[in-house]
Amino acid sequence: MEDFVRQCFNPMIVELAEKAMKEYGEDPKIETNKFAAICTHLEVCFMYSDFHFIDERGESIIVESGDPNALLKHRFEIIEGRDRIMAWTVVNSICNTTGVEKPKFLPDLYDYKENRFIEIGVTRREVHIYYLEKANKIKSEKTHIHIFSFTGEEMATKADYTLDEESRARIKTRLFTIRQEMASRSLWDSFVSPKEAKRQLKKNLRLQELCASLPTKVSHRTSPALKTLEPM
């Protein structure tokens, strides 16, 4: 699964997911299903925001090619993917500027057109079950919830889907592609089934313990290939 994640997702998304997991003391090499889930969620958040701007009249517009006009403002503020301190700083700044109620939990996005925070969900289960779980956790009518599934289903607060149909279709297509790619590598079943995922996690832990017991020769040189991946 780890190899699939690194091949399937943009390196920036992979790096953000790794940082997020390490912030909570989790290892992407062991909890590979969680690694894949975080990368998927991050990509959906970025796709949700892509190409959406607000013009000088306050209207929402889509700009898909070239540099957007200087007068245009990004419609969505992306909160997901930031470290917790920076994320809360952004949330507090938005609340102070707009007067919206501060959420109890970190949301994923802020919509400057509708003036509301958005919680994005990506589920391998039934969308309505995951939606209810999110709603029960957040317990706030002010935070908008939008759930996507790998089967093309979606559910949103008051059936308000925020984005146009084409933008949502792009997200659904990407999720379906991820599912197909996982299935072709025999990874989908363990990604969906908690029982199978637990078995895979134990296998990863055993492999790590085995590798740790082997004698190793440490090299302090950085390969040319790895140098290209180092942050600037």
Curated annotation (Swiss-Prot):
It comes from Influenza A virus (strain swl A/California/04/2009 H1N1). The probable endonuclease active site in the N-terminus and the basic amino acid cluster in the C-terminus are important for the shutoff activity. The C-terminus acts as a nuclear localization signal. The C-terminus is recruited to host protein complexes involved in nuclear Pol II RNA processing. The record marks K195, K198, R199 as: Important for efficient shutoff activity and nuclear localization. Its EC number is 3.1.-.-. It is found in: Host cytoplasm; Host nucleus. This is Protein PA-X. The lineage of its organism: Viruses, Riboviria, Orthornavirae, Negarnaviricota, Polyploviricotina. Disulfide bonds: none annotated. Belongs to the influenza viruses PA-X family. It comes from the Viruses. Plays a major role in the shutoff of the host protein expression by cleaving mRNAs probably via an endonuclease activity. This host shutoff allows the virus to escape from the host antiviral response. Hijacks host RNA splicing machinery to selectively target host RNAs containing introns for destruction. This may explain the preferential degradation of RNAs that have undergone co- or post-transcriptional processing. The active site is at E80, D108, K134. Keywords: Decay of host mRNAs by virus, Eukaryotic host gene expression shutoff by virus, Host cytoplasm, Host gene expression shutoff by virus, Host mRNA suppression by virus, Host nucleus, Host-virus interaction, Hydrolase, Viral immunoevasion. The record marks K202, K203, R206 as: Important for efficient shutoff activity. Its main location: host cell.
